A protein has these predicted regions:
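Helical-face signature of the major facilitator-like transporter fold
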Residues: 4, 92-104
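Central cavity-lining transmembrane alpha-helices of secondary-active solute carriers
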Residues: 32-56
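C-terminal ends and interior cores of transmembrane alpha-helices
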Residues: 68-87
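Symmetry-related core transmembrane helices of the 12-TM Major Facilitator Superfamily/SLC fold
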Residues: 152-156
Length: 156
């Protein structure tokens, strides 16, 4: 369940960072609108997981998918760099949409694996809620023990 807690922490932390960065370039209603875009894109990533897994099993070439997974951190790091250092509404929105597409996919994968591990468990909801609470605790510690947006973001 540690993977769920880490996912919740990264997802919520990235959303918080995105909102703070967008607030530099738009008014509060613009931040809410941009947030709705990134959360909507994360739904596409979440739904894409099952389609990609089905496609992967039918393709007969798992090496290509492994290579894509191996190199995925490079554009993700670039997305975070743009989120930290990018200037302008559209740069931040683009990097945010990209990151949340990937986070949606990873969230779907994490929840699927957790569901597999919890199959037959007597208390799956309790386990997931504890993982969420741990993710929120990490978020609290990140915001209260680390100072500065760059340091907090680096912790993500």
């Amino acid at each position: 369940m540690l993977s769920l807690a880490v996912f919740y922490f990264v997802f919520l932390g990235t959303e918080y960072l995105f909102d703070n960065r967008m607030a530099l370039y738009t008014d509060p209603s613009g931040v809410v609108l941009a947030q709705s875009y990134i959360l909507g894109v994360s739904v596409f990533g979440f739904l894409a997981y099952s389609l990609i897994e089905k496609w992967k099993s039918k393709s007969g070439n798992p090496t290509a998918f492994k290579a894509a997974g191996f190199f995925l951190p490079v554009p993700v790091i670039a997305g975070y760099v743009l989120l930290f250092a990018g200037t302008g509404y559209w740069v931040l929105l683009g990097s945010g949409c990209f990151l949340f597409l990937i986070l949606g996919y990873l969230g779907s994968r994490t929840h699927y694996l957790a569901a597999q591990l919890l199959r037959g468990s007597r208390h799956p909801a309790k386990t997931v809620s504890v993982a969420y609470a741990v993710g929120l605790l990490l978020q609290f510690l990140n915001h209260n023990l680390l100072w500065g947006e760059t340091v907090e973001g680096s912790f993500l």
